[in-house]
Amino acid sequence: MSRRKENEEVDKQTRIAIVSDDKCKPKRCRQECKKTCPVVRMGKLCIEVTPTSKIASLSEELCIGCGICVKKCPFEAITIINLPSNLEKHTTHRYSKNSFKLHRLPIPRPGEVLGLVGQNGIGKSTALKILAGKQKPNLGKYANPPDWTEILSYFRGSELQNYFTKILEDNLKALVKPQYVDQIPKAVRGAVGDLLDKKDERELQTKICEMLDLSHIRDREIAQLSGGELQRFAIAMVCIQNADIFMFDEPSSYLDVKQRLNAALTIRSLLHPTKFIIVVEHDLSVLDYLSDFICCLYGVPGCYGVVTMPFSVREGINIFLDGFVPTENMRFRTESLTFKVSESATEEEIKRMNHYVYPAMVKTLGKFELTVEKGHFSDSEILVLLGENGTGKTTFIRMLAGNLQPDGEVELPMLNISYKPQKISPKFQNHVRHLLHDKIRDAYVHPQFIADVMKPMKIEEIMDQEVQNLSGGELQRVALVLCLGKPADVYLIDEPSAYLDSEQRLVAAKVIKRYILHAKKTGFVVEHDFIMATYLADRVIVIEGQPSVKTTAFSPQSLLNGMNRFLELLGITFRRDPNNFRPRINKNNSVKDTEQKRSGQFFFLEDEACN
Protein backbone atom coordinates (compact mmCIF):
# COMPACT_ATOMS: atom_id res chain seq x y z
CA MET A 1 0.00 0.00 0.00
CA SER A 2 2.77 2.44 0.97
CA ARG A 3 4.49 1.85 -2.41
CA ARG A 4 1.30 2.91 -4.21
CA LYS A 5 0.99 5.98 -2.04
CA GLU A 6 4.58 6.92 -2.82
CA ASN A 7 3.92 6.62 -6.56
CA GLU A 8 0.86 8.85 -6.24
CA GLU A 9 2.94 11.33 -4.29
CA VAL A 10 5.56 11.46 -7.07
CA ASP A 11 2.82 11.81 -9.68
CA LYS A 12 1.33 14.77 -7.83
CA GLN A 13 4.60 16.53 -7.39
CA THR A 14 5.88 16.43 -10.94
CA ARG A 15 3.27 18.82 -12.28
CA ILE A 16 3.40 22.57 -12.16
CA ALA A 17 0.55 24.98 -12.95
CA ILE A 18 1.31 28.59 -13.86
CA VAL A 19 -1.32 31.34 -14.10
CA SER A 20 -0.09 34.56 -15.69
CA ASP A 21 -0.90 37.68 -13.61
CA ASP A 22 -0.95 39.87 -16.73
CA LYS A 23 -3.18 37.67 -18.88
CA CYS A 24 -5.72 36.16 -16.44
CA LYS A 25 -8.83 38.38 -16.17
CA PRO A 26 -11.64 36.40 -14.43
CA LYS A 27 -14.04 39.37 -14.60
CA ARG A 28 -13.78 39.56 -18.40
CA CYS A 29 -14.42 35.88 -19.22
CA ARG A 30 -16.97 33.18 -18.45
CA GLN A 31 -14.46 31.26 -16.32
CA GLU A 32 -14.20 28.54 -18.95
CA CYS A 33 -11.26 26.95 -17.09
CA LYS A 34 -13.41 26.19 -14.04
CA LYS A 35 -16.50 25.10 -16.02
CA THR A 36 -14.66 22.61 -18.23
CA CYS A 37 -12.27 21.12 -15.63
CA PRO A 38 -13.16 17.40 -15.14
CA VAL A 39 -11.88 17.47 -11.53
CA VAL A 40 -14.17 20.42 -10.66
CA ARG A 41 -17.08 18.57 -12.27
CA MET A 42 -16.39 15.67 -9.91
CA GLY A 43 -16.92 18.10 -7.04
CA LYS A 44 -13.30 18.85 -6.05
CA LEU A 45 -11.93 22.40 -5.89
CA CYS A 46 -9.17 22.06 -8.48
CA ILE A 47 -9.73 25.55 -9.95
CA GLU A 48 -11.01 28.31 -7.69
CA VAL A 49 -12.24 31.73 -8.81
CA THR A 50 -13.96 33.78 -6.10
CA PRO A 51 -15.79 37.05 -6.89
CA THR A 52 -12.95 39.00 -5.24
CA SER A 53 -9.98 37.10 -6.73
CA LYS A 54 -7.82 38.89 -9.28
CA ILE A 55 -6.62 35.66 -10.94
CA ALA A 56 -7.72 32.03 -10.98
CA SER A 57 -6.08 29.68 -8.48
CA LEU A 58 -5.12 26.13 -9.58
CA SER A 59 -4.41 23.31 -7.17
CA GLU A 60 -1.34 21.38 -8.35
CA GLU A 61 -2.20 18.49 -6.00
CA LEU A 62 -5.65 17.92 -7.54
CA CYS A 63 -4.72 18.72 -11.16
CA ILE A 64 -4.63 15.63 -13.41
CA GLY A 65 -2.77 17.38 -16.23
CA CYS A 66 -5.54 16.94 -18.83
CA GLY A 67 -4.79 20.40 -20.29
CA ILE A 68 -8.44 21.26 -21.03
CA CYS A 69 -8.24 24.56 -19.10
CA VAL A 70 -5.12 25.51 -21.09
CA LYS A 71 -7.03 25.11 -24.38
CA LYS A 72 -10.27 26.72 -23.17
CA CYS A 73 -8.80 29.85 -21.52
CA PRO A 74 -9.64 32.76 -23.89
CA PHE A 75 -6.60 34.77 -22.69
CA GLU A 76 -4.10 31.88 -22.87
CA ALA A 77 -3.22 32.62 -19.25
CA ILE A 78 -2.72 29.04 -18.01
CA THR A 79 0.33 26.83 -18.53
CA ILE A 80 0.52 23.29 -17.17
CA ILE A 81 3.89 21.60 -17.35
CA ASN A 82 4.81 18.06 -16.45
CA LEU A 83 8.24 18.41 -14.85
CA PRO A 84 11.00 16.22 -16.32
CA SER A 85 11.65 14.39 -13.04
CA ASN A 86 10.74 14.70 -9.40
CA LEU A 87 12.32 18.08 -8.78
CA GLU A 88 10.04 18.93 -5.87
CA LYS A 89 12.67 18.09 -3.28
CA HIS A 90 15.15 20.50 -4.89
CA THR A 91 12.91 23.61 -4.93
CA THR A 92 14.92 26.62 -3.80
CA HIS A 93 12.39 29.40 -4.25
CA ARG A 94 8.86 30.02 -5.44
CA TYR A 95 7.33 33.49 -5.51
CA SER A 96 3.68 32.53 -4.88
CA LYS A 97 1.03 29.97 -5.81
CA ASN A 98 0.92 29.21 -9.56
CA SER A 99 4.04 31.29 -10.23
CA PHE A 100 7.71 30.85 -11.21
CA LYS A 101 9.75 28.22 -9.38
CA LEU A 102 13.56 27.86 -9.17
CA HIS A 103 15.22 24.48 -8.54
CA ARG A 104 18.68 24.26 -6.97
CA LEU A 105 21.26 27.09 -6.90
CA PRO A 106 24.59 27.80 -8.60
CA ILE A 107 27.53 27.06 -6.29
CA PRO A 108 30.09 29.91 -6.25
CA ARG A 109 33.71 29.14 -5.36
CA PRO A 110 36.13 31.65 -3.82
CA GLY A 111 38.94 32.84 -6.11
CA GLU A 112 37.13 31.80 -9.32
CA VAL A 113 34.64 33.37 -11.74
CA LEU A 114 31.32 31.52 -12.01
CA GLY A 115 29.46 32.06 -15.31
CA LEU A 116 25.70 31.53 -15.61
CA VAL A 117 24.18 30.73 -19.00
CA GLY A 118 20.50 30.24 -19.86
CA GLN A 119 17.49 31.80 -21.53
CA ASN A 120 15.74 34.98 -20.38
CA GLY A 121 13.14 34.43 -17.65
CA ILE A 122 14.66 31.18 -16.40
CA GLY A 123 15.77 32.39 -12.96
CA LYS A 124 19.31 33.77 -13.38
CA SER A 125 18.45 37.11 -11.76
CA THR A 126 16.48 35.31 -8.99
CA ALA A 127 19.54 33.11 -8.30
CA LEU A 128 21.76 36.24 -8.13
CA LYS A 129 19.35 37.91 -5.67
CA ILE A 130 19.41 34.84 -3.39
CA LEU A 131 23.21 34.48 -3.54
CA ALA A 132 23.61 38.21 -2.83
CA GLY A 133 21.51 37.80 0.32
CA LYS A 134 18.86 40.20 -1.03
CA GLN A 135 16.17 37.49 -1.28
CA LYS A 136 15.56 34.80 1.34
CA PRO A 137 15.02 31.41 -0.36
CA ASN A 138 11.65 29.98 0.76
CA LEU A 139 12.31 26.38 -0.47
CA GLY A 140 8.93 26.47 -2.27
CA LYS A 141 6.99 27.12 0.98
CA TYR A 142 5.62 30.51 -0.08
CA ALA A 143 2.62 30.39 2.32
CA ASN A 144 4.75 29.67 5.37
CA PRO A 145 8.37 30.73 4.62
CA PRO A 146 11.01 28.80 6.61
CA ASP A 147 13.45 30.53 8.96
CA TRP A 148 17.22 30.54 8.38
CA THR A 149 17.83 27.53 10.68
CA GLU A 150 15.62 25.39 8.46
CA ILE A 151 17.18 26.81 5.28
CA LEU A 152 20.71 26.07 6.53
CA SER A 153 19.79 22.53 7.55
CA TYR A 154 18.28 22.07 4.04
CA PHE A 155 21.65 22.99 2.45
CA ARG A 156 23.52 20.87 5.02
CA GLY A 157 26.57 19.10 3.61
CA SER A 158 26.83 21.28 0.49
CA GLU A 159 29.17 24.20 -0.21
CA LEU A 160 26.15 26.51 -0.01
CA GLN A 161 25.80 25.85 3.74
CA ASN A 162 29.11 27.62 4.50
CA TYR A 163 28.27 30.32 1.95
CA PHE A 164 24.89 31.19 3.54
CA THR A 165 26.34 30.93 7.07
CA LYS A 166 28.93 33.58 6.11
CA ILE A 167 26.22 35.80 4.60
CA LEU A 168 24.10 35.49 7.77
CA GLU A 169 26.97 36.38 10.07
CA ASP A 170 27.19 39.47 7.87
CA ASN A 171 30.76 38.73 6.97
CA LEU A 172 30.05 38.94 3.24
CA LYS A 173 29.21 42.16 1.43
CA ALA A 174 27.65 41.70 -2.01
CA LEU A 175 27.70 44.19 -4.90
CA VAL A 176 25.51 43.74 -7.98
CA LYS A 177 25.90 45.46 -11.35
CA PRO A 178 22.28 45.76 -12.52
CA GLN A 179 21.09 44.28 -15.81
CA TYR A 180 19.29 47.38 -17.11
CA VAL A 181 21.95 50.09 -17.13
CA ASP A 182 19.69 52.44 -19.12
CA GLN A 183 17.68 52.91 -15.88
CA ILE A 184 20.73 54.34 -14.00
CA PRO A 185 20.14 58.04 -14.96
CA LYS A 186 16.66 57.85 -13.34
CA ALA A 187 18.18 56.77 -10.02
CA VAL A 188 21.51 58.63 -9.92
CA ARG A 189 22.46 62.23 -10.69
CA GLY A 190 25.83 63.95 -10.82
CA ALA A 191 29.12 63.92 -12.71
CA VAL A 192 30.86 60.61 -13.43
CA GLY A 193 34.09 61.63 -11.63
CA ASP A 194 32.29 62.79 -8.45
CA LEU A 195 30.26 59.59 -8.19
CA LEU A 196 33.36 57.42 -8.66
CA ASP A 197 35.29 59.47 -6.05
CA LYS A 198 32.56 58.86 -3.44
CA LYS A 199 32.82 55.08 -3.77
CA ASP A 200 36.58 54.67 -4.37
CA GLU A 201 37.37 52.30 -1.49
CA ARG A 202 40.15 50.29 -3.14
CA GLU A 203 42.03 53.35 -4.47
CA LEU A 204 42.24 51.76 -7.91
CA GLN A 205 39.99 54.26 -9.62
CA THR A 206 42.58 55.63 -12.08
CA LYS A 207 43.66 52.15 -13.18
CA ILE A 208 40.08 50.91 -13.64
CA CYS A 209 39.04 54.08 -15.52
CA GLU A 210 41.97 53.54 -17.90
CA MET A 211 41.08 49.86 -18.45
CA LEU A 212 37.45 50.75 -19.18
CA ASP A 213 38.30 53.89 -21.18
CA LEU A 214 36.37 56.22 -18.85
CA SER A 215 39.04 58.85 -18.18
CA HIS A 216 37.77 61.27 -20.88
CA ILE A 217 34.15 61.30 -19.63
CA ARG A 218 34.81 62.02 -15.93
CA ASP A 219 33.33 65.54 -16.16
CA ARG A 220 30.16 64.46 -17.95
CA GLU A 221 26.76 64.22 -16.26
CA ILE A 222 25.23 60.73 -15.95
CA ALA A 223 22.19 61.88 -17.96
CA GLN A 224 24.40 62.62 -21.01
CA LEU A 225 26.06 59.19 -21.21
CA SER A 226 25.34 56.72 -24.03
CA GLY A 227 24.38 53.08 -23.34
CA GLY A 228 27.97 51.83 -23.68
CA GLU A 229 29.33 54.57 -21.41
CA LEU A 230 26.67 53.83 -18.77
CA GLN A 231 27.58 50.13 -18.92
CA ARG A 232 31.29 50.85 -18.39
CA PHE A 233 30.47 53.32 -15.59
CA ALA A 234 28.32 50.67 -13.84
CA ILE A 235 31.13 48.07 -14.09
CA ALA A 236 33.65 50.62 -12.74
CA MET A 237 31.37 51.51 -9.79
CA VAL A 238 31.33 47.85 -8.71
CA CYS A 239 35.06 47.28 -9.31
CA ILE A 240 36.30 50.24 -7.22
CA GLN A 241 34.42 49.20 -4.06
CA ASN A 242 35.41 46.69 -1.39
CA ALA A 243 33.20 43.61 -1.24
CA ASP A 244 33.33 39.83 -0.87
CA ILE A 245 30.83 38.94 -3.61
CA PHE A 246 30.87 40.72 -6.98
CA MET A 247 27.96 40.06 -9.35
CA PHE A 248 27.67 41.27 -12.91
CA ASP A 249 24.34 40.91 -14.72
CA GLU A 250 24.98 41.08 -18.50
CA PRO A 251 28.15 43.23 -18.47
CA SER A 252 28.61 43.22 -22.26
CA SER A 253 25.35 44.71 -23.58
CA TYR A 254 25.89 48.03 -25.43
CA LEU A 255 29.66 47.39 -25.67
CA ASP A 256 31.70 46.72 -28.82
CA VAL A 257 34.08 43.75 -29.16
CA LYS A 258 37.13 45.62 -27.82
CA GLN A 259 35.23 47.06 -24.85
CA ARG A 260 33.73 43.63 -24.07
CA LEU A 261 37.20 42.15 -23.69
CA ASN A 262 38.44 45.11 -21.64
CA ALA A 263 35.40 44.70 -19.37
CA ALA A 264 36.19 40.96 -19.05
CA LEU A 265 39.81 41.71 -18.09
CA THR A 266 38.66 44.35 -15.56
CA ILE A 267 36.26 41.86 -13.94
CA ARG A 268 38.99 39.19 -13.81
CA SER A 269 41.33 41.72 -12.14
CA LEU A 270 39.06 41.48 -9.05
CA LEU A 271 40.04 37.83 -8.48
CA HIS A 272 41.27 37.10 -4.96
CA PRO A 273 41.49 33.76 -3.05
CA THR A 274 38.67 34.82 -0.68
CA LYS A 275 36.33 36.68 -3.08
CA PHE A 276 33.41 35.29 -5.10
CA ILE A 277 32.64 36.57 -8.62
CA ILE A 278 29.44 35.62 -10.49
CA VAL A 279 28.66 36.72 -14.06
CA VAL A 280 25.48 36.34 -16.13
CA GLU A 281 26.30 36.75 -19.82
CA HIS A 282 24.63 35.99 -23.17
CA ASP A 283 27.62 36.60 -25.44
CA LEU A 284 29.09 33.09 -25.33
CA SER A 285 32.59 34.05 -26.54
CA VAL A 286 32.89 36.67 -23.74
CA LEU A 287 31.48 34.22 -21.17
CA ASP A 288 34.06 31.67 -22.33
CA TYR A 289 36.88 34.24 -21.96
CA LEU A 290 35.67 35.48 -18.57
CA SER A 291 34.67 32.38 -16.57
CA ASP A 292 36.58 29.64 -14.75
CA PHE A 293 33.56 27.34 -14.49
CA ILE A 294 29.91 27.45 -15.59
CA CYS A 295 26.40 26.53 -14.40
CA CYS A 296 23.70 26.15 -17.07
CA LEU A 297 20.04 26.92 -16.40
CA TYR A 298 17.27 25.12 -18.29
CA GLY A 299 13.50 24.86 -18.01
CA VAL A 300 10.52 26.81 -19.34
CA PRO A 301 10.92 30.63 -19.26
CA GLY A 302 8.53 32.24 -16.77
CA CYS A 303 7.44 28.82 -15.39
CA TYR A 304 10.40 27.01 -13.85
CA GLY A 305 14.19 26.97 -14.02
CA VAL A 306 16.70 24.28 -13.02
CA VAL A 307 20.38 24.96 -12.26
CA THR A 308 22.87 22.26 -13.28
CA MET A 309 25.94 21.30 -11.27
CA PRO A 310 29.12 23.29 -12.13
CA PHE A 311 31.05 22.31 -15.29
CA SER A 312 34.33 23.44 -16.83
CA VAL A 313 33.92 26.42 -19.20
CA ARG A 314 34.18 24.47 -22.44
CA GLU A 315 31.99 21.63 -21.25
CA GLY A 316 29.35 23.98 -19.76
CA ILE A 317 28.90 26.04 -22.93
CA ASN A 318 28.87 22.89 -25.09
CA ILE A 319 26.18 21.35 -22.84
CA PHE A 320 24.09 24.50 -23.24
CA LEU A 321 24.49 24.40 -27.03
CA ASP A 322 23.84 20.63 -27.23
CA GLY A 323 20.68 20.94 -25.15
CA PHE A 324 21.60 17.81 -23.18
CA VAL A 325 22.92 17.49 -19.59
CA PRO A 326 24.82 14.16 -19.41
CA THR A 327 25.10 14.13 -15.59
CA GLU A 328 21.29 14.23 -15.24
CA ASN A 329 20.56 12.38 -18.50
CA MET A 330 18.25 15.26 -19.33
CA ARG A 331 17.49 16.69 -22.79
CA PHE A 332 16.10 20.22 -22.50
CA ARG A 333 16.13 21.24 -26.18
CA THR A 334 15.07 19.12 -29.14
CA GLU A 335 17.93 20.10 -31.46
CA SER A 336 21.50 21.10 -30.70
CA LEU A 337 22.93 24.42 -31.91
CA THR A 338 26.06 24.11 -34.05
CA PHE A 339 28.17 26.60 -35.95
CA LYS A 340 29.07 24.83 -39.11
CA VAL A 341 29.90 27.59 -41.57
CA SER A 342 26.41 28.03 -42.92
CA GLU A 343 25.02 27.44 -46.36
CA SER A 344 25.95 29.88 -49.10
CA ALA A 345 24.99 30.18 -52.74
CA THR A 346 26.46 27.82 -55.38
CA GLU A 347 28.48 29.06 -58.39
CA GLU A 348 25.48 28.57 -60.69
CA GLU A 349 23.33 30.79 -58.48
CA ILE A 350 26.06 33.46 -58.26
CA LYS A 351 26.05 33.86 -62.07
CA ARG A 352 22.32 34.59 -62.05
CA MET A 353 22.55 37.16 -59.25
CA ASN A 354 22.17 40.92 -59.47
CA HIS A 355 25.33 42.81 -58.58
CA TYR A 356 25.20 46.33 -57.15
CA VAL A 357 27.94 48.90 -56.65
CA TYR A 358 27.99 51.72 -54.11
CA PRO A 359 30.37 54.68 -54.73
CA ALA A 360 33.14 56.11 -52.54
CA MET A 361 31.52 58.54 -50.08
CA VAL A 362 32.49 61.01 -47.36
CA LYS A 363 30.27 62.23 -44.55
CA THR A 364 31.11 64.91 -41.99
CA LEU A 365 28.99 65.16 -38.84
CA GLY A 366 30.31 67.97 -36.61
CA LYS A 367 33.92 66.99 -35.80
CA PHE A 368 33.48 63.41 -37.05
CA GLU A 369 34.44 62.40 -40.59
CA LEU A 370 33.67 59.01 -42.17
CA THR A 371 35.27 57.98 -45.47
CA VAL A 372 33.69 55.05 -47.31
CA GLU A 373 35.67 53.18 -49.97
CA LYS A 374 33.86 52.06 -53.13
CA GLY A 375 32.41 48.55 -52.83
CA HIS A 376 29.95 46.11 -54.35
CA PHE A 377 27.44 43.55 -53.14
CA SER A 378 25.11 40.98 -54.68
CA ASP A 379 21.89 39.12 -53.90
CA SER A 380 21.76 36.37 -51.25
CA GLU A 381 24.73 37.68 -49.30
CA ILE A 382 25.19 39.21 -45.87
CA LEU A 383 27.86 41.83 -45.20
CA VAL A 384 28.77 42.33 -41.55
CA LEU A 385 30.18 45.71 -40.47
CA LEU A 386 32.96 45.37 -37.89
CA GLY A 387 34.29 48.31 -35.93
CA GLU A 388 34.38 49.87 -32.48
CA ASN A 389 31.56 52.02 -31.11
CA GLY A 390 31.66 55.53 -32.59
CA THR A 391 33.40 54.52 -35.86
CA GLY A 392 30.37 55.33 -38.04
CA LYS A 393 28.78 51.92 -38.69
CA THR A 394 25.25 53.26 -38.15
CA THR A 395 26.13 56.39 -40.20
CA PHE A 396 27.25 54.15 -43.11
CA ILE A 397 24.03 52.12 -42.88
CA ARG A 398 21.91 55.30 -42.80
CA MET A 399 23.72 56.68 -45.89
CA LEU A 400 22.91 53.45 -47.76
CA ALA A 401 19.31 53.66 -46.55
CA GLY A 402 19.04 57.21 -47.89
CA ASN A 403 18.25 58.61 -44.40
CA LEU A 404 21.49 60.60 -44.47
CA GLN A 405 22.86 62.48 -47.47
CA PRO A 406 26.65 62.03 -48.11
CA ASP A 407 28.77 65.17 -48.67
CA GLY A 408 28.89 66.35 -52.30
CA GLU A 409 27.09 64.90 -55.31
CA VAL A 410 27.05 61.11 -54.97
CA GLU A 411 24.79 58.73 -56.84
CA LEU A 412 23.69 55.77 -54.74
CA PRO A 413 22.08 52.70 -56.38
CA MET A 414 18.28 53.03 -56.42
CA LEU A 415 17.10 50.27 -54.10
CA ASN A 416 14.16 49.57 -51.83
CA ILE A 417 15.50 49.41 -48.31
CA SER A 418 14.19 47.97 -45.03
CA TYR A 419 15.97 49.28 -41.92
CA LYS A 420 15.97 48.01 -38.32
CA PRO A 421 17.48 50.78 -36.17
CA GLN A 422 19.76 50.20 -33.18
CA LYS A 423 17.45 51.85 -30.65
CA ILE A 424 13.86 50.64 -30.69
CA SER A 425 11.29 52.88 -29.00
CA PRO A 426 7.72 51.56 -28.93
CA LYS A 427 5.33 54.38 -29.91
CA PHE A 428 2.54 52.13 -31.21
CA GLN A 429 -0.56 52.28 -28.99
CA ASN A 430 -2.07 48.85 -29.68
CA HIS A 431 -1.38 45.10 -29.73
CA VAL A 432 1.45 43.38 -31.61
CA ARG A 433 -1.13 41.79 -33.94
CA HIS A 434 -2.38 45.25 -35.03
CA LEU A 435 1.17 46.49 -35.53
CA LEU A 436 2.03 43.56 -37.84
CA HIS A 437 -1.30 43.96 -39.65
CA ASP A 438 -0.60 47.67 -40.27
CA LYS A 439 3.03 47.38 -41.32
CA ILE A 440 3.49 44.01 -43.04
CA ARG A 441 -0.04 42.86 -43.88
CA ASP A 442 0.96 40.58 -46.79
CA ALA A 443 3.97 38.93 -45.16
CA TYR A 444 2.51 38.11 -41.76
CA VAL A 445 -0.26 35.89 -43.18
CA HIS A 446 2.00 34.24 -45.79
CA PRO A 447 2.61 30.57 -44.81
CA GLN A 448 6.28 30.67 -45.93
CA PHE A 449 7.00 33.81 -43.85
CA ILE A 450 5.19 32.31 -40.85
CA ALA A 451 7.26 29.10 -41.07
CA ASP A 452 10.63 30.79 -41.79
CA VAL A 453 10.44 33.86 -39.54
CA MET A 454 7.42 34.14 -37.23
CA LYS A 455 7.47 30.59 -35.75
CA PRO A 456 11.21 30.44 -34.92
CA MET A 457 11.06 33.98 -33.44
CA LYS A 458 8.07 32.86 -31.27
CA ILE A 459 5.95 35.87 -32.23
CA GLU A 460 2.68 33.92 -31.78
CA GLU A 461 3.16 33.98 -27.97
CA ILE A 462 3.20 37.78 -27.80
CA MET A 463 0.62 38.57 -30.53
CA ASP A 464 -2.03 39.80 -28.07
CA GLN A 465 0.24 41.87 -25.85
CA GLU A 466 0.37 45.67 -25.91
CA VAL A 467 3.46 46.90 -27.79
CA GLN A 468 4.12 49.40 -24.97
CA ASN A 469 4.39 46.58 -22.39
CA LEU A 470 6.88 44.37 -24.25
CA SER A 471 10.28 43.59 -22.71
CA GLY A 472 13.51 44.51 -24.53
CA GLY A 473 13.94 41.03 -26.01
CA GLU A 474 10.31 40.83 -27.19
CA LEU A 475 10.57 44.27 -28.82
CA GLN A 476 13.76 43.21 -30.59
CA ARG A 477 12.05 40.11 -32.01
CA VAL A 478 9.07 42.15 -33.23
CA ALA A 479 11.42 44.73 -34.82
CA LEU A 480 13.31 41.95 -36.67
CA VAL A 481 10.06 40.46 -37.98
CA LEU A 482 8.87 43.91 -39.13
CA CYS A 483 12.20 44.53 -40.88
CA LEU A 484 12.24 41.16 -42.71
CA GLY A 485 8.52 41.34 -43.52
CA LYS A 486 8.84 44.55 -45.52
CA PRO A 487 9.47 43.88 -49.25
CA ALA A 488 12.93 45.32 -50.07
CA ASP A 489 16.15 44.69 -52.03
CA VAL A 490 18.47 45.43 -49.12
CA TYR A 491 17.92 44.76 -45.41
CA LEU A 492 19.94 46.94 -43.03
CA ILE A 493 19.94 45.43 -39.54
CA ASP A 494 21.62 47.31 -36.68
CA GLU A 495 22.58 45.13 -33.67
CA PRO A 496 20.00 42.32 -33.93
CA SER A 497 21.39 40.59 -30.80
CA ALA A 498 20.71 43.40 -28.28
CA TYR A 499 18.46 42.23 -25.40
CA LEU A 500 18.22 38.67 -26.79
CA ASP A 501 19.47 35.70 -24.78
CA SER A 502 22.10 33.28 -26.14
CA GLU A 503 19.53 30.89 -27.56
CA GLN A 504 17.41 33.60 -29.21
CA ARG A 505 20.57 35.12 -30.73
CA LEU A 506 21.40 31.88 -32.54
CA VAL A 507 17.79 31.46 -33.68
CA ALA A 508 17.71 35.09 -34.92
CA ALA A 509 21.01 34.57 -36.79
CA LYS A 510 19.63 31.44 -38.50
CA VAL A 511 16.37 33.22 -39.41
CA ILE A 512 18.19 36.23 -40.93
CA LYS A 513 20.65 34.00 -42.82
CA ARG A 514 18.00 31.67 -44.23
CA TYR A 515 15.62 34.49 -45.17
CA ILE A 516 18.25 36.56 -47.01
CA LEU A 517 19.53 33.50 -48.90
CA HIS A 518 16.12 32.16 -49.93
CA ALA A 519 14.53 35.53 -50.72
CA LYS A 520 17.64 36.38 -52.84
CA LYS A 521 18.16 39.72 -51.07
CA THR A 522 21.18 41.45 -49.52
CA GLY A 523 21.74 42.09 -45.82
CA PHE A 524 24.01 44.62 -44.10
CA VAL A 525 24.36 43.75 -40.40
CA VAL A 526 26.10 45.60 -37.56
CA GLU A 527 26.87 43.07 -34.81
CA HIS A 528 29.19 42.99 -31.76
CA ASP A 529 28.42 39.43 -30.63
CA PHE A 530 31.35 37.67 -32.28
CA ILE A 531 29.73 34.25 -32.55
CA MET A 532 26.69 35.77 -34.26
CA ALA A 533 28.82 37.93 -36.57
CA THR A 534 30.86 34.93 -37.77
CA TYR A 535 27.72 32.88 -38.33
CA LEU A 536 26.03 35.61 -40.39
CA ALA A 537 28.90 36.99 -42.45
CA ASP A 538 29.52 36.07 -46.09
CA ARG A 539 31.82 39.08 -46.38
CA VAL A 540 33.05 41.68 -43.94
CA ILE A 541 33.43 45.49 -44.05
CA VAL A 542 36.08 46.60 -41.54
CA ILE A 543 35.92 50.18 -40.23
CA GLU A 544 39.22 51.51 -38.86
CA GLY A 545 40.38 54.82 -37.43
CA GLN A 546 39.94 56.97 -34.35
CA PRO A 547 36.37 56.65 -32.99
CA SER A 548 34.29 59.87 -33.10
CA VAL A 549 37.09 61.69 -34.98
CA LYS A 550 38.11 60.21 -38.35
CA THR A 551 37.40 56.69 -39.63
CA THR A 552 37.48 54.74 -42.90
CA ALA A 553 35.15 51.96 -44.07
CA PHE A 554 37.13 49.63 -46.35
CA SER A 555 35.58 47.82 -49.28
CA PRO A 556 34.09 44.38 -48.46
CA GLN A 557 36.57 41.52 -47.87
CA SER A 558 36.19 37.76 -47.47
CA LEU A 559 35.25 36.50 -43.99
CA LEU A 560 38.76 35.18 -43.29
CA ASN A 561 40.68 38.29 -44.44
CA GLY A 562 38.22 40.72 -42.86
CA MET A 563 38.20 38.95 -39.50
CA ASN A 564 42.00 38.65 -39.54
CA ARG A 565 42.35 42.38 -40.17
CA PHE A 566 39.82 43.30 -37.48
CA LEU A 567 41.27 40.94 -34.86
CA GLU A 568 44.78 42.18 -35.58
CA LEU A 569 43.57 45.70 -34.67
CA LEU A 570 42.23 44.31 -31.38
CA GLY A 571 45.20 42.01 -30.72
CA ILE A 572 43.00 38.93 -30.11
CA THR A 573 43.15 35.46 -31.64
CA PHE A 574 40.36 32.90 -32.07
CA ARG A 575 40.31 29.13 -32.40
CA ARG A 576 37.36 26.87 -33.18
CA ASP A 577 35.83 24.32 -30.84
CA PRO A 578 36.26 20.80 -32.33
CA ASN A 579 32.72 19.70 -31.26
CA ASN A 580 30.42 22.42 -32.55
CA PHE A 581 32.85 24.76 -34.36
CA ARG A 582 31.99 27.82 -32.27
CA PRO A 583 34.72 30.49 -32.22
CA ARG A 584 36.61 30.64 -28.90
CA ILE A 585 38.91 33.47 -27.79
CA ASN A 586 42.43 32.35 -26.88
CA LYS A 587 43.60 33.49 -23.45
CA ASN A 588 46.14 36.29 -23.85
CA ASN A 589 49.77 35.08 -24.25
CA SER A 590 48.72 31.41 -24.15
CA VAL A 591 50.67 28.96 -26.36
CA LYS A 592 47.92 28.96 -29.01
CA ASP A 593 47.63 32.76 -28.87
CA THR A 594 51.38 33.34 -29.35
CA GLU A 595 51.55 30.71 -32.10
CA GLN A 596 48.65 32.24 -34.09
CA LYS A 597 49.93 35.80 -33.68
CA ARG A 598 53.35 34.74 -34.94
CA SER A 599 51.87 33.11 -38.05
CA GLY A 600 49.46 36.05 -38.63
CA GLN A 601 46.39 33.78 -38.37
CA PHE A 602 44.20 35.65 -35.93
CA PHE A 603 41.01 33.94 -37.05
CA PHE A 604 40.93 30.20 -37.62
CA LEU A 605 38.79 28.49 -40.22
CA GLU A 606 41.06 25.48 -40.65
CA ASP A 607 38.22 22.97 -40.33
CA GLU A 608 35.97 24.74 -42.80
CA ALA A 609 36.94 22.25 -45.49
CA CYS A 610 35.50 19.34 -43.54
CA ASN A 611 32.20 21.05 -42.69
From Swiss-Prot:
- Which SMART domains does the record associate with it? AAA
Gene3D superfamilies, A to Z: P-loop containing nucleotide triphosphate hydrolases
UniProt superkingdom:
Eukaryota
Domain 4Fe-4S ferredoxin-type, chain residue ranges per copy: 15-45, 54-83
Q: Specify the effect of residue 231 to L.
A: Embryonic lethal
* SUPFAM superfamilies per the UniProt record, alphabetical: 4Fe-4S ferredoxins (SSF54862), P-loop containing nucleoside triphosphate hydrolases (SSF52540)
Q: Where in the cell is it found?
A: Cytoplasm
PTM note = Ubiquitinated by Cnot4. Ubiquitination mediates the recruitment of autophagy receptors to the mitochondrial outer membrane and initiates mitophagy.
Q: Name one GO molecular function term.
A: ATP binding
Keyword ATP-binding applies: yes
Which keywords annotate this record?
4Fe-4S, ATP-binding, Cytoplasm, Iron, Iron-sulfur, Metal-binding, Nucleotide-binding, Translation regulation, Ubl conjugation
Leader sequence residues = none
- List residues binding ATP: 118-125, 387-394
> What sequence ranges are listed for the domain ABC transporter?
78-323, 350-570
Looking at the UniProt record for this protein, which Gene Ontology cellular component terms does it annotate, in alphabetical order?
cytoplasm; cytosol
Report the domain remarks. Answer: The ABC transporter 2 domain is necessary and sufficient for association to the 40S ribosome subunit.
Q: What does this protein do?
A: Plays a role in translation initiation and quality control of translation. Together with pelo and HBS1, is required for 48S complex formation from 80S ribosomes and dissociation of vacant 80S ribosomes. Stabilizes core components of eIF3 complex promoting their assembly into translation initiation-competent complexes.
Family of this protein: Belongs to the ABC transporter superfamily. ABCE family.
Subunit organization: Interacts with components of eIF3 complex, namely eIF3a, eIF3j, eIF3b, eIF3c and eIF3i. Associates with the 40S ribosome subunit in an ATP-dependent manner and independently from the presence of the eIF3 complex. Forms a complex with Git and Pak; the interaction with Pak may be mediated by pix/dPIX.
Q: What is this protein called?
A: Protein Pixie
Question: Lineage of the native species?
Answer: Eukaryota, Metazoa, Ecdysozoa, Arthropoda, Hexapoda
